[in-house]
Amino acid sequence: MRRIAVTGAAGRMGKTLIEAVQQTGGVAGLTAAIDRPDSTLVGADAGELAAIGRLGVPLTGDVARAVDEFDVLIDFTHPSVTLKNLDVCRRAGKAMVIGTTGFSPEEKERLAAAAREIPIVFAANFSVGVNLCLKLLDTAARVLGDDVDIEIIEAHHRHKVDAPSGTALRMGEVVAEALGRDLQKVAVYGREGQTGARPRETIGFATVRAGDVVGDHTVLFAADGERVEITHKASSRMTFAKGAVRAALWLDEKPAGLYDMQDVLGLI
């Protein structure tokens, strides 16, 4: 049995991950659940927190104390928290599945450095559907080339703290790479006032934060006379949780390295 730990276990995504781990039919099991050290829920049963029944796994506030209890840590938290957990896992030789978004380029370099010592799956989105969309976006960009205007529109719930979403940025990276462009130079994040005519080479991003939207992403390829839209809409966090658990199982026996969901799904 693959021993899995979940950090951020008392949050919305953490609870969903706990449920997803327990749906593997015994292939994997939750052996540790971690949240903030100051959480009033420390000591509570992880299964009861996730409303799936008692599991006998108490919530702890310290990854280091639980590090001997798991083979792989699934982390959907905050960059600062993830990087602390990364240091613990690197020293202990534990694998990680990272779904945290909002990393700076320098922080991503720290992930890459740690991946020289431990296996890590790092992805902006663990949905199978989104990763299929990334493959389709690469194809669409190469076929449509420089004859289209490209816009990326994403929507999430009011509680999401980073914008644009990591998934939207990854979509932009895929499209830019396919077209031989540098996303940092061509990205336009929102528009206001007298912007002038739209330069063809730019890739625009528009962000919506409202209600309880789990995650909607649309990439628009607009030409004169026609347009192509590639859209993914998530209706449940379980979509991401199942993908993360799939990645955790896939990492078994994998050598050190930085992988993503394209590797897990065999799309590369």
Curated annotation (Swiss-Prot):
It comes from the Bacteria. It is an enzyme of class 1 (oxidoreductase). NAD(+) binds at residues 8-13, 35, 99-101, 123-126. It holds the Pfam family DapB_C. Its EC number is 1.17.1.8. GO terms for biological process: diaminopimelate biosynthetic process; lysine biosynthetic process via diaminopimelate. One of its GO terms (molecular function) is 4-hydroxy-tetrahydrodipicolinate reductase. Keywords: Amino-acid biosynthesis, Cytoplasm, Diaminopimelate biosynthesis, Lysine biosynthesis, NAD, NADP, Oxidoreductase. The keyword NAD applies. Its main location: cytoplasm. It is found in: Cytoplasm. The active site is at residues 156, 160. The keyword Amino-acid biosynthesis applies. It catalyses: (S)-2,3,4,5-tetrahydrodipicolinate + NAD(+) + H2O = (2S,4S)-4-hydroxy-2,3,4,5-tetrahydrodipicolinate + NADH + H(+); (S)-2,3,4,5-tetrahydrodipicolinate + NADP(+) + H2O = (2S,4S)-4-hydroxy-2,3,4,5-tetrahydrodipicolinate + NADPH + H(+). NADP(+) binds at residue 36. GO terms for cellular component: cytosol. Pathway: Amino-acid biosynthesis; L-lysine biosynthesis via DAP pathway; (S)-tetrahydrodipicolinate from L-aspartate: step 4/4. HAMAP family: DapB (MF_00102). Catalyzes the conversion of 4-hydroxy-tetrahydrodipicolinate (HTPA) to tetrahydrodipicolinate. Belongs to the DapB family. This is 4-hydroxy-tetrahydrodipicolinate reductase. It comes from Stutzerimonas stutzeri (strain A1501) (Pseudomonas stutzeri).
